[in-house]
Amino acid sequence: MSKQQKLIDEGEIAADYLEQFLDIIDFDGDIDLDVEGDRASVSIDGGDSLDMLVGRDGQVLEAIQTLTRLAVQEVSGERSRLMLDIARWRANRR
């Protein structure tokens, strides 16, 4: 399996996990997958209600990213370097 395909698979595992997470906390969001350089990138967009999932200085976002990486690692057996963005918070800080 190519490195590109592994990253795509990693993104799909993350998207499945995040979909379940959003369902549990009763939030709506559109999940987009991408590969940027040597890491999978997942973003959740869907309005101002998602700001709560970013938190102060991105602290909640970082926590969700860590949980998502652990979920990916549990399924894939490999350490994840996945990057998560919510409500374009990271994109707007670049």
Residue spans of the language-model regions?
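RNA-contacting regions in translation and RNA-metabolism proteins
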Residues: M1-R94
